[in-house]
């Protein structure tokens, strides 16, 4: 403190400790020591420069830590207090002290108000340091000027705390009560009693301040006057003479990554041109990537171009910008009409030779099919609609439309470009199109599609191999009539759904959500590979039943999302999963109901039909297959059931769509099922309702769809009609008799009203069923299962669990997906299992240990109202099953139609008939109690893959977890990593309070950031809640419900929150006594409930998500994945355990949340990197068929869409990354935007922008190189000149420079024949444009353009100039005297450059261009030629 009284610092710093720029009026600091800087900023004699203060707080972290800085400010403040209090007689000295005090106060207030999230929130020590200073014990003795300053800082601190933590109670006094504020003592969040911070959590403001570059940039600009226009410095003195040798190509294309400019490197894959050549001059290698910059939503949402063929060419004329546009042979009419997928294209017609809705696309020429773009389309469509070879080829064409994969179809539809070169009448076009020579297409766009299709093809091949092993070479057959009848209905539904990206909620960087599609396909491929490897390894051992089969079965059951299955006495119909176009955004926006995942079954032929008469079971011993976890972008396989005719064993089958890189293997079935067990299983299934089957035959992994409610209703009525024709009376009778027997035994054994069992119709082989499965957004898993058995009685006769077998865990240990904890959990709980159940339920015997605990029987059957007005009597037994059913995602029709939330997990495990649903009493009770608050829960986990469709989104499992006390069932098996139980457990640990709070509306309403958007209002949530309540209101007796809900449940082992949190900490151990005796765990539950609250309040596990609406989720996956790497910051102190808060270090959070994602990302990148072109139509030897797609569009449209893309990418650059120059000096070597998309999580915003810039330059050069004729080259070059001219008008300097650099490249300049043909007007424009990147006077032309921008037009700045300046400036020293005198000028120059950049990026918000998804997709998903191909074509 004494330092501020020394003569070098009092009253202002002397030239010994500070120096100023001599030639500037504002006297900016050139160099200074740290105390002198503080004195300068709080100078009592000079005017206050608020801009200089704001700049200081942006850059000080480069030379002093926040803690040291605030210590200095506190010392300065206390020095001022001493000056005021000890110099009462010296008026002048006292006056100087007062002015310095106020100015120091301004600095502290600025820091608290604007950098609370960045500096204080992650640093508990700093927070406590400042709180200690503000809680000054002597505040009452100070003069009012001092106490007023301190009280003002206290108020600011309270304000910021409330801004950062929602619902925090600080008990601060009234704002005007001066005396109360004098005595008010601040407390840190961690020092509050748990009562006062209950329900609090990090706010949207806090999260965006961490993770959203755009929000952070806006916050910085808000510190300055809006009238300020920052300018780039005209002069930059670099200490390195290499600056004089720089050239534009050096700046933009460092040798190591450019495809076009690298002459000495042999690369198998072309690398991205890197704009940061200047940065390679700087020897400072930045080792870590930015954790803040992310791909913006605009780019990510861009649709793939639908066709890779050029539609039209615009005519070049002597006048500028008169363009001749190619007519498109491939613009599907349904693209604009939103009606269907590819049926408007030539794809299906080329396969079935039938007339098509697009007359121009018709073709009957096989040469077209094989040699032209149409052949490629046919190949891709076949890939989407992969069918088993045993299918009757005659009906392939009818099947196609129903099985297509909408997101892949849309990708092809939007990206593909096919054109005709000459303007003709439509009839002439049609005739010419039949000649394959005239059909030209954009080969580069087609390569982008083929890159994804190759993944899809690989997946199909793997499925085929897995099925071959599983089916033991059994060739399933298909009942053609049934299939045909089914497809007629399918096609009708298909016409109602269409994939169309939203114009409001999309990411221009990935408008077709390709990142999500590719991620899910890649996950599927990885899982299938693991499955296949395990199958091959275990082939011989699988010949005998494994001793740990029971444990494995239990694990599989736990992985099931739905426990429904459909049995037809001994006959499983072969099923063909149909893909419906689920992309009609219009049909989605009207309902909030969850998507329906539909499967349709067709039947096997007569060989199977014979078995219909006898209710025997079949064995499904195929290995468990883990398919793609595509949230919406993937389809399930057409899997036919494999069952040897003479086998009567029971088995559980499941297909897990897992994002986990490892897939569990399956083990062989066992023959331990009693006859009675089979009977029970036959009885319990009601086949009137939609059911789910696992299939092993068909090869299309992607054939599932999400249906809207309307189409499902129509389908149900259709199916009901069809089913009536196939009723089998004989089976009905035998079914009914066994039902009665079972009822008697149930009454005798359990005393429970467990009447879930209803008579069911029997159907012959021509059944038409809707198959449903649950998609779990939180984990990105889709699980399909046939449940092994149902726990409805505690009778030992049903037991199929052998404790002796379960003692062996050899097979389980091989399954790397299972955590050691879960293994322990599994082994111990299995030993205590006295029920046959391996489904997720609590056995009756465990629920009701005594007659006293059993519920009273209902005297009346509860009534259930249905939308059609009918009231259906429910069975009068209590539902004990708590298996997660399809109902947990697909709510009842009446609740969907009211837009309400989905039902709880405690719904009936048996599929309901269309007009009847059995309601769990506990569920009914809890609905009433909790007001269905949980309906606001949505996607939660960091690792989540967005499963939303274009405008619809699935409810989260945690919705039901809140209501389901019995969801965690230790006595039935382990909670598997891949299981929904595990997912819900994780979600509960993150988002639910301890049990005592779950019945309170307020504390139970835990919204995640996914659910809250900035614009979200509580009224919307209240409306949803009201809908839910009205939808679920039933006529059940509340008193009886109350009794049932309050019954003891002895089967719960631990508080699930406790278990989850202990697992998170690695301290969980299963209590080694019987699961029934669980009271010993109560103490642990109480002890850790505080921890659960803290985790919830701070939301440590789910920091990086901000979207809430389904439409927002449409674009969020890419952004969410990028954001998720940002916030690995500890928000709570390790040392505050005495307050009941344990450590939540970033390591723990990071490990639990991000390890999986990192492993997956690396595997996906490797998969994409393995792509090689095999199709001759896509090779450069076929360049005579190439026409760039830009010739199909006018240059104005192309410029607008390119501007939207660049705007979003530059919006991902964070001011701090730019200031610190956080970037790689060697960009990734990629040849397509897809390859960049899958790497985006590892790239900072700067790296992403540079890579995109270089990719675009390479793409422009590649388009010109691939074009064969000089005339066509001329057209392409002219079109790019026109686009560049429009970009200059739009002030989109990034795209402008991309085009200029590409056209200026030596490769393009070689084509003198083409340049000679260019129109004079366009040559004049080109002469003007190519002066812009001139090196004269330090890029003065581009600097003048950037400094003279009109903000209202919008602006996309040329990032390379800024990076060049920052790199040159980085060569200066940080310190003039090491750790004493800082080179302040260096940092001040940096901040001026950064402010200029982020200001111009913010001006891009003034663009009002309309999105053209087809063109945007083509512009986003670009590919380039490889290094070798460029060399070959340019020589």
UniProtKB/Swiss-Prot annotation:
Keyword Cell division in record: yes
Sequence ranges of Low complexity compositional bias: 237-249, 654-667
Stretches of the chain forming a coiled coil according to its record: none
Domain N-terminal Ras-GEF intervals: 25-157
Biased composition regions of type Basic and acidic residues, renumbered to the chain: 582-606, 723-744
SUPFAM superfamilies, sorted: Ras GEF
Keywords: Cell cycle, Cell division, Cytoplasm, Guanine-nucleotide releasing factor, Mitosis, Phosphoprotein
Domain Ras-GEF: 1194-1434
Modified sites of kind Phosphoserine: 271, 559, 689, 808, 810, 1028, 1109
Cell compartments where the protein resides: Cytoplasm; Bud
GO molecular function: guanyl-nucleotide exchange factor activity
Residue ranges, annotated region (Disordered): 235-256, 338-365, 582-689, 723-747, 851-871
Record InterPro entries: Ras-like_GEF (IPR008937), Ras-like_Gua-exchang_fac_N (IPR000651), Ras_G-nucl-exch_fac_CS (IPR019804), Ras_GEF_dom_sf (IPR023578), RASGEF_cat_dom (IPR001895), RASGEF_cat_dom_sf (IPR036964)
GO biological process, one term: positive regulation of exit from mitosis
Phosphothreonine PTM sites in chain numbering: 691
Gene Ontology terms: cellular component: cellular bud; cytoplasm; plasma membrane
Gene3D superfamilies in UniProt: Ras guanine-nucleotide exchange factors catalytic domain, Son of sevenless (SoS) protein Chain: S domain 1
Family assignment from sequence similarity: Belongs to the LTE1 family.
Function: GDP-GTP exchange factor for TEM1, a Ras-like protein, component of the mitotic exit network (MEN). Activation of TEM1 by LTE1 in the bud ultimately leads to activation of CDC15 followed by the release of CDC14 from the nucleolus, which then inactivates cyclin-dependent kinases (CDKs) activity by several mechanism. Required for TEM1 localization to the bud cortex during mitotic exit. Fine-tunes the timing of the mitotic exit and couples this event with cytokinesis.
Subunit structure: Interacts with CDC24, CDC42, KEL1, KEL2, RAS2 and TEM1.
Protein's UniProt name: Guanine nucleotide exchange factor LTE1
